[in-house]
A protein has these predicted regions:
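A residue-level marker of the well-folded mature domains of exported/periplasmic proteins
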Residues: 1-197
Length: 197
């Protein structure tokens, strides 16, 4: 399963089907579940978040150099899904990347309390733009925030997929995850009859 919100269901299935291996992305309950067929996995997304923050910081510097904003108004907005460790570590990495390029930058975070709500993500982005954020990033799963950014002409950094089709004039980059190495490793372990790491 590839979403945080699926973990309780995967735990139930793992208990019901002990001869099947279950792997759940982004969760945290496998180790304490007592189920030998339940596994959690994640990637080093903080690295991609940091690099996308560097890109955002470079864009802020460009906007400062062009006179569109000042160092004092280099404010970034971040649309987060939930105030969970995964989201907080993600926006922290992103902001460290931003500040590596634009030390005067500040950041405001708003949460949707949903992993995927186009309307809430769009509303959060619009609210951040109204709060004078000049660049928006996200840890949420729809194109809501980039849609708001494109309409307002505000640069944005996406998540999971390229947002260029949604925001062709404002999307800078997206932090994305390559799950393939884990899937290959877990599948090979099942085929070989070895433990899944």
């Amino acid at each position: 399963a590839n979403s945080f919100g699926h973990e309780s269901y995967i735990l139930q299935a793992a208990a019901e089907f002990p001869n099947v291996q279950f792997c759940h992305a982004t969760g945290y309950q496998a180790a304490g579940s007592g189920l030998s067929n339940m596994h959690n996995y994640f990637t080093s997304i903080y690295e991609s978040r940091y690099v996308s923050g560097v890109v955002a910081g470079m864009k802020l510097n460009e906007m400062i150099a062009d006179g569109k904003i000042t160092e004092d108004t280099a404010k970034v907005g971040y649309v987060g899904a939930y105030p969970y460790a995964e989201v907080i570590s993600g926006f922290t990495s992103f902001f460290l990347g931003v500040r590596s390029q634009c030390p005067s930058a500040t950041m405001e975070v708003k949460y949707t309390n949903s992993w995927a709500s186009f309307d809430l993500e769009k509303e959060c982005a619009e609210s951040l733009i109204a709060d004078k954020c000049v660049l928006i990033s996200q840890h949420a799963d729809t194109t809501g925030a980039p849609t708001a950014c494109e309409a307002a002409g505000v640069p944005c950094v996406g998540y999971n997929i390229s947002m260029i089709p949604t925001a062709p004039n404002t999307a800078l980059t997206s932090a994305s995850i390559n799950w393939e190495p884990y899937y290959e490793s877990a599948t090979k372990s099942v085929i070989d009859g070895t433990a899944i790491d």
